[in-house]
Structures are given as structure tokens and as C-alpha cells.
Amino acid sequence: MDMDKIDVPNGYALSAGTSTIFLNSSVAYDTNADWITGANSIRFNNGDGLYDDVRTSNNGDGGGLGPVYAGYSCGSCHRNAGRTKPTLWENGGSGNYGFSSMLVYISRRNGAFFRDYGRVLHDQAIYGVKPEGKLSVTYDKQTFSFPDGETYELCKPNYTITEWYKDSIAPEDLFCTVRIPLRHVGMGQMMAIDRREIEALAAKSNYPEYGISGRCNYITEKGVTGVGLSGNKAQHLDLTVELGFSSDMGVTNSRYPEEICEGQAQINQGSMMGLSYDQLDISTADMEDVDLYMQSLGVPARRNINDPQVILGEQKFYEAKCHLCHVTTLHTQAGGSTLLNGTRLPWLGGQTIHPYSDFLLHDMGSEIMGVGLNDNYVSGLARGNEWRTTPLWGIGLQEKVNGHTYFLHDGRARNLTEAIMWHGGEGEASKNLFKQMSKEE
């Protein structure tokens, strides 16, 4: 276990209260909080196994993959409970086929889904079945300069889909947006946050001198309307365990009992190969264990808090007004969070946490290189140019855990500097303040 450079905790170093863990290693995202004991420890380990298990197309336990799919396990995209490198970047952005670590959402230009595809394009399929399509990408690169003359690049992706399983869709009628997985750090703490505190932040998130005004994304799921916290656009009320199994892997469950390719020729091909579609691929109890696993992961403590460079960086973080959106401190509600079956995790309640996010929607601009971070994709109340403030806890360990430093929703930023320089709209003022800093700062 790598314990180097772990400081004695104080102040903001305790990222998640009693769920804070003191690890600086490749398993820093994938380790349970200390309060997981007894029967919950057994369930945590079962959920961990199900999260990483490679699904097969066979009937029965561990099966149900496909017939078409985007990933073969939760861990194939959320490696070590983190985020995998965008595959197409890994191959130089040359248009390489396959995006096992990327999800592509497609629709018509008017927002309607394509009848034969649904909302997610599945580029992989089991033997004997044709994938729905293949994605390729090119990058428009533009060079900019800091005041001291040092240059940086911003790379705007352009996506093309070919090899449609059915009739080709004309580019002028097609809209697509790409995602790489989010880190699963602090999921339980996020679900336990008192929503009234988020609404209070929205009410006071009005800083006209910096152009900042955040708002909640109100979502209705399972007949309940509330403040969305989960997802790039805060478009979900829970961790979407059932949706992930169904939409990403084709694994049917009690909430999504139909195959994702229902109505396509692929489902008939699967039947001819002896696959059964009349039973669910994963039990509700197993999904609840995956949910427990995700909500029980610890959050790495802040590191090197006494390092002079870290202290200077924190000072500049506030001077650049990053904290107006990346809010330092929030609180969890007294009862903790809730699992899929309604069971509460009271250990997550009554905690002071430091996610560095307000979990609100903010306009991230539409003018950098022509489009900024506007993907034209609407999620609930979130418009195309609006994104949830990304929590920053654990972000400094991403390279150690996942082996890369790609950031933003589609991985276009190759490091944190590029991620900051992509900020437009409500992030424009902070970006410009950052740009004026010296290299040391």
C-alpha cells in the first residue's frame, strides 16, 4: 500500500468525513469506507465482484450480455471505479473503430430518438450479431498563448458514424454527443447531500460581476420529482445502476425487463443461437449490492496540505473565484442515503464533506472555437451549453488510478490546464484570471 505523502488530516483534508480514506495508490477510488463491516462487508464484496465481472452472452448467472452493447462490465468503462481513457484519443484521434470506454448518445436534430436505435449507439455485439454502428473522430486543433508566450492547444472533436446496422442515417439528420465515464468517487456522499442545501446554493448563486448564475436540474424518475445530482448534466436522481446494466450492457433487470434491441433483427438472431430472453439477467438483490458497493466507496483525503506549492495553489483557486461553482463544503442529511430497495445508509448522514462542487447547472459557453462546451444535448432542464459542476475530490489521483489525465465530458482536455481553458460562459472570468497568473502560480 502506497502511503507516501499522506499528511495528518485537518480542515478540508477530511474530504468525506468518516468516509475519508488515507490512500495514495491505484486502488484509492476502489476501497471501501471504514464503516463497512459485517453483513454489509459481504454485500460490498459481492457488489464489487458484480461491478467488475465480465458479462457473457450465456443465459444464467454472469450472462445476459447484448445482443448489442457498449461495455461488457461496469469496470470496463469505470476502471478501478474511475474513468478509462477515451479510446479514440488513445489511438491518436485517427478514426480508429471501437469506443469501449466511450458512450455515444444519438438522436434526430429535433431531439427525437431514432426508432431502430434508441438513445445510445451500441458499437459492439455478441457473435453472430451486427453492431448498431461504428464511431470515428477527427480533432480540430487550435493553438493559443499565455501572456508569457507559452502556448497550449485546444482540440475540438468531430464525430462520424458509419457501418449502420440498418439504413444509414444522413449526417444532416443526425445529432450525437460523446461521454467518457465519470469517476465513482463519493457517490454515497453525493446521494446523501441535503437537497435543500443545493436549492439554497441555487438561490444565492448569482454573481453578476463574474457572470455566474447556477440552477438546479429538476428531474422526474420513478414517479418522483427532485433535484438531480448524478451525471454530467445532473440528469438523474440516483446512481442509475439499473439503467447502466440495461443500456450499456444489455443486461435486463426488474426496472428494464426488455432487451435494448427489442424490435431489431438482432434479437431474432440471438434467439436462433439459443439465447433466452424470457428471464431477467440480473436479480434485484444483486443490483442492490452493486448500489451498496458504489455508495460505500471511500473518498481519498486531500494530500500534501502543508506543501507550500499546494498552499499557494489553494490561495489562487480562491483568487480565481473557482470556489463560486466548485463549492468547497457541503453537508449530508441526517438519515444518510438510500439504496434501490429503500434501505438507508445512516453512516453517510450528518457529515461535513468537501466535494468542491455545487452540483448546479452552469452555462459553459458556446464561443470557444465556434462551439465551446455546447453539445446541443438536452437533459431534463439542462440545455446543451449547461453542465453540472464536476466534483474535484480525488481528481489528483486519476493518473495514478487510471493512467491518464483526460478530462471533461468527452475527454477532449488532455490535462487540467486544457480543461480550465475550455471554460467559457459562466467560467470565462475564472479562466481569464487563471490565464493571467504566472507559471508558478
Question: Where do the protein language model's features map onto the residues?
Answer:
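Gly/Gly-Pro-rich "capping" loops immediately C-terminal to redox-active cysteine motifs
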Residues: 65-71, 75, 85-107, 183-187, ...
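Bulky hydrophobic/aromatic packing residues
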Residues: 44, 54, 58, 159, ...
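A generic secondary-structure signal for well-formed alpha-helical elements
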Residues: 51-58, 78-85, 188-192, 294-301, ...
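Extracytoplasmic redox metalloprotein regions
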Residues: 19-43, 50-287, 291
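The canonical Cys-X-X-Cys-His
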Residues: 47, 69-81, 184, 290, ...
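Long, well-ordered mid-to-C-terminal structural blocks that present hydrophobic/aromatic surfaces
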Residues: 290-350
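Extracellular low-complexity, Gly/Ser/Thr-rich intrinsically disordered linkers
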Residues: 255-299, 304, 309-315, 386-441
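Bacterial Sec-dependent N-terminal signal peptides
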Residues: 1-18, 22
